[in-house]
Amino acid sequence: MTKKDKKPKVATITTKSGETLKVFEDLAQFEDFLKHETEDDDDFDNVHCQLKYYPPFVLHEAHDDPEKIKDTANSHSKKYVRHLHQHVEKHLLKEIKEALQLPDLKFKDKSKDEDFEKIVWNYGDTGEFHDRKFRISISVTCKHDDAMVDLDYKTVPLTEESVI
């Protein structure tokens, strides 16, 4: 038997507008990236990442086998939506704050957009790290057709003019 290949599940894409976008498939690797991004890189205040993953509670229920995930685990299930919202509010945002080493982030700019196709939770806040202010925006989307969650993470530097 061969060992399972543990290569990082990340792809770097350059959009038509020239923006660099990192796409992750694993929550732990995304969190590791955030932690190392603030430690190692000067571009921590200008990052755009996307993550597509199954929430831990879904994988736990399916015994860590994506093939066993129920078809009912989607945005039409009240139980799934409730558990996903708890996962985002109590775990994901907290882990992002810890990875960024910014315990003062409160993500007080919250909104929820809901339609038949999907539910989107938006979170935003401003932070400061190494005397540089930036805006952080997180968008979490669940769709009606499967349990996969899309997370969009973006930081934008704030200049003195944009703060005033």
From Swiss-Prot:
Domain of life: Eukaryota
Keywords noted in UniProt: Cell membrane, Membrane
Gene3D superfamilies per UniProt: Respiratory growth induced protein 1 (3.40.1000.40)
Compartments reported by the entry: Cell membrane
Membrane topology according to the record: Peripheral membrane protein
Annotated coiled-coil segments of the chain: none
Alphabetized Pfam families for the sequence: RGI1 (PF10843)
InterPro entries found in the cross-reference section: RGI1, RGI1_sf
GO cellular component: plasma membrane
Biological process terms in GO annotation: energy reserve metabolic process
Similarity comment: family membership: Belongs to the RGI1 family.
Role summary: Involved in the control of energetic metabolism and significantly contribute to cell fitness, especially under respiratory growth conditions.
Official protein name in the record: Respiratory growth induced protein 1
Protein source organism: Vanderwaltozyma polyspora (strain ATCC 22028 / DSM 70294 / BCRC 21397 / CBS 2163 / NBRC 10782 / NRRL Y-8283 / UCD 57-17) (Kluyveromyces polysporus)
